[in-house]
């Protein structure tokens, strides 16, 4: 692997994460411009459209996306991935953006890796290392600063934002853990494409798209397309391609560009006002996730041992 390949991977992953952050800003703009647009409607449109595009792309590159349905167990896992992983990470995130703003929603969602660490501690008996422990304390303090602004007897953000943001962080964990057994066999394009598409279809139970009449201007449709194409499909393909050049631990470090881009673009284009507590708390959470990512080799070695045992 040459240095040029490594830099290419870093660049691809960085741009992908920035695009994910920008999609949150685009959603926040859309919610502000058109109050008839709901988080549920936007999530359905995003998931169904992006999922269909990824599946078509998978078919074009001969990834055989329909192979995943030949076994009942893999089909059920795809459905659970969509409903328990992708729905909370996308719908709950958009709800947090709608009731709050993109930077705060993205930063709270960024706590997802620590939920994964807690899961492995409780159910896989993996004791956190010292760096992980330090990271968890940093993340807790950062969250406390954002939520209370230093006043421990009151909340500085709406409880609704905190609840939706917390659910989206849990979604990050389930979104990572549930599809893991499927990825080596079927590939990320097929697994993610089906997860998005199935989840988007299932969300019609709560609000059928054909019964929702939302009138959008050309500019608002442009924001929807930006969220689908530049905020979902393109960054996913770029990030998946980047993993061919860089380690997953390096890629997860670059995830920090998502809350950073959401913050910068929200301040520039939406005039979102963030307090010193928000900025310091967000910085602590981002640094905490970096500490966790740098310690990721231990978790990777754990997976290798488990695979060897089975």
Name every feature range the model reports, one short phrase each.
Residues 1-44, 154-181, 201, 303-310:
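Glycine-/small-residue-enriched transmembrane alpha-helix faces in small-molecule transporters
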Residues 5-10, 35-44, 68-75, 133, ...:
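Juxtamembrane helix-entry segments on the extracytoplasmic side of multipass membrane proteins
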Residues 10-14, 72-80, 128-140, 161-162, ...:
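Cytoplasmic-side transmembrane-helix entry/capping segments in multi-pass membrane proteins
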Residues 17, 45, 86, 90, ...:
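Helix-helix packing/entry segments at the starts of transmembrane helices
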Residues 30, 42, 46, 96, ...:
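Hydrophobic/aromatic residues within transmembrane alpha-helices
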Residues 35-88, 115-119, 170-178, 192-210, ...:
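Transmembrane alpha-helices of multi-pass small-molecule transport proteins
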Residues 54, 128-150, 265, 277-296:
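Hydrophobic transmembrane alpha-helices of multi-pass small-molecule transport proteins
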Residues 61-103, 145, 228-246:
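Specific transmembrane alpha-helical segments of multi-pass solute transporters/efflux pumps
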């Amino acid at each position: 692997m040459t240095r040029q390949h490594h830099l290419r991977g870093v660049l691809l992953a960085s741009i992908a994460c920035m695009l994910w952050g920008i999609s949150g800003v685009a959603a926040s703009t859309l919610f502000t411009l058109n109050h008839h647009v709901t988080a549920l409607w936007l999530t359905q449109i995003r998931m169904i459209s992006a999922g269909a595009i990824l599946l078509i792309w998978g078919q074009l590159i001969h990834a055989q996306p329909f192979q995943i349905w030949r076994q009942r167990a893999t089909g059920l896992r795809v459905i659970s991935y969509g409903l328990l992983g992708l729905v909370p990470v996308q719908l709950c995130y958009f709800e947090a953006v709608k009731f709050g703003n993109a930077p705060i929603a993205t930063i709270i969602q960024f706590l997802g890796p620590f939920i994964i660490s807690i899961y492995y501690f409780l159910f896989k008996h993996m004791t956190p290392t010292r760096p992980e422990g330090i990271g968890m304390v940093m993340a807790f303090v950062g969250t406390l600063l954002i939520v209370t602004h230093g006043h421990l007897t009151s909340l500085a953000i709406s409880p609704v934002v905190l609840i939706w943001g917390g659910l989206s962080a849990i979604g990050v964990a389930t979104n990572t853990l549930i599809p893991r057994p499927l990825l080596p066999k079927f590939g990320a394009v097929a697994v993610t494409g089906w997860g998005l598409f199935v989840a988007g279809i299932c969300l019609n139970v709560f609000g059928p798209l054909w019964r929702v009449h939302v009138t959008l201007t050309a500019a608002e449709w442009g924001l929807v397309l930006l969220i689908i194409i530049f905020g979902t499909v393109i960054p996913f393909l770029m990030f998946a391609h980047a993993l061919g050049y860089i380690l997953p631990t390096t890629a997860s470090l670059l995830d920090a560009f998502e809350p950073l881009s959401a913050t910068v673009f929200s301040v520039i284009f939406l005039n979102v006002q963030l307090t010193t507590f928000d900025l310091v708390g967000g910085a602590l959470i981002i640094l905490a996730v970096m500490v966790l990512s740098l310690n990721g080799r231990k978790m990777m070695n754990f997976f290798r041992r488990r695979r060897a045992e089975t």
